[in-house]
Amino acid sequence: MLVLRSALTRALASRTLAPQMCSSFATGPRQYDGIFYEFRSYYLKPSKMNEFLENFEKNAHLRTAHSELVGYWSVEFGGRMNTVFHIWKYDNFAHRTEVRKALAKDKEWQEQFLIPNLALIDKQESEITYLVPWCKLEKPPKEGVYELATFQMKPGGPALWGDAFKRAVHAHVNLGYTKLVGVFHTEYGALNRVHVLWWNESADSRAAGRHKSHEDPRVVAAVRESVNYLVSQQNMLLIPTSFSPLK
C-alpha cells in the first residue's frame, strides 16, 4: 500500500508540474504570425551624424525598394547621443534572408550608400521583435515626437506577465494624453524585453500627460500590479527624420 501511494503521489506531482513548466517558458501566440519587426540602432561618429542622415535620405528609395521601412528616428533624450533608430517590417525570416541577399547584390545601394557610409558608423545593434497579440501597429494622426519605453520583464514571457502589462498600457491609453503606436516583444536580442512605442504632440505635452497619469488611481493600480513582473525599464525620446514614414 505504501509503495502504491508513493507511486500515485509521484504521478500526480508530475501532472501538476508540467503545466507550470510550460507556462514559465511560453512566449505567447505572437509566434504564429510570421510578420516581425527588426529594430536597428546605429551609433554614429559625433561629427558624422548629419552627413549620414543626408546620405540616407538621398538613397532611401534604394533601400525601401527591398523591404518596408516603418520609421526612422534620431535619439534626442535617454540614450546614447548621435544615434539613429529605425524599424523594418518583414513577412517572415525567409523574407528577410531574401532581402539581405538582394541588398548584397544591389550595386547602386552598395556603391552609393553602404560602402561610402560604413566609416561613419561606430557601432550597430539589431533586435527581432513581434507585436504582442493584443496590439496592432497604429499610425499617429499628425507629426509629433515619439517615446520608446523599454521594459525588462521577469522570465516567463507574456504567459506570465502579459495581462498585467496590457492593463498598465491601456490605463495610460485611456487617459488620452498619448497615442499607442505599438507594443513589441523581443524574439532575438535581450529576451523578456518589451518595447512600447508612443506618439505625443511634443515633449511638453508628454510631460504634462505623465504628471496627470501619476495622479490617476486607475493608472496607479495597474502599474502597481505590473511592476511585480518588472526587472528594469528605460526610455528614449525619438525625433522622426524627414524621410520617416511615421512622423
Curated annotation (Swiss-Prot):
Please state where this protein is localized: Cytoplasm, Cytosol
Q: Which domain of life is it from?
A: Eukaryota
GO annotations under biological process? mitophagy
Q: Which Pfam family name is an example for this entry?
A: NIPSNAP
Cellular component per GO?
A: cytosol; mitochondrion; nucleus
**Record's keyword terms, sorted:** Acetylation, Cytoplasm
Keyword Nucleotide-binding part of the UniProt annotation = no
* Tissue specificity statement from the Swiss-Prot or TrEMBL entry: Ubiquitous. Highly expressed in liver, kidney and muscle. Expressed at intermediate level in brain, heart, colon, thymus, kidney, small intestine, placenta, lung, leukocytes and spleen.
- As stated in the Swiss-Prot or TrEMBL entry, residues carrying the post-translational modification N6-acetyllysine are 48, 166
Q: Which family does it belong to?
A: Belongs to the NipSnap family.
Q: Which PANTHER family match?
A: NIPSNAP-RELATED (PTHR21017), PROTEIN NIPSNAP HOMOLOG 3A (PTHR21017:SF23)
* The protein's name: Protein NipSnap homolog 3A
Its taxonomic path starts at: Eukaryota, Metazoa, Chordata, Craniata, Vertebrata
